[in-house]
Amino acid sequence: YATHAVQSTYGYEYQGDNLLLARVNLLLTYAEHLQARWQRKPTKEELRPIANIISWNLWQMDGLHLSVPGGKPQPETKQLDLFSMFGAAEPQPPTVSCKVKNWRKGSHGTAQNFETIQEGSTSMKFDYVIGNPPYQDERQGTSTTALPVYNNFMDASYKVGSSVMLITPARFLFNAGRTPKQWNEQMLNDEHLKVLYYEKDGEKVFPNTDIKGGVAITYRDEKQSYGAIGTFTIFPELNLILRKVKNKIVKGNSLAD
């Protein structure tokens, strides 16, 4: 089953260093599963076919053109003169299609061009998307005065996916920080949003990084209603008590009930 799970995992990345990290992490995930399931490390003979699958399933691609990245940087814009503006255009190298394997066809899988998978589809579909957006605008001020931008990415991600999990600074949970107060209140009153994890010491999550107010992992599912966060505290038990008290007040019942 672990091999089938790896065969079913696909992804592409434009930058080569990020691609290498993704491949290594997926291989380590397989090794950790084997250690947890059978209490032993995988052998080279076991890792070799898994590494081959990963090298096919995680590939380098320009997602805009569905092709192998050319690797040539775009030339800087230059001012054209009367004689050069009518010159012959520089020929562009032909794009090279990316190939992926369907491991359910043939004993060693069947390779096919990636764009053929897209035939009949007007948009690219994803099971999940992983990203690392910036937390603040570093062009403005220092690390303590720069304006946060993670709230914009949270709003954008909610428009793209019906279920979204994010790790962000946690100040907005206390209606603090430099995010807009109106946005903070919107998040705290969102019935589809809940806090999965909170750590007040940000360095425990991101070493050597001072994140004022701590770090939170939030989960939003537009198809589920968890009840508004309202007033957030660092103690889950207290959050539960607060929610029960508020429900009593809203229903007009006595707290003694």
Task: Identify the residue ranges that each predicted region occupies.
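Flexible, glycine-/basic-rich loop-and-beta segments that form/coincide
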Residues: 205-257
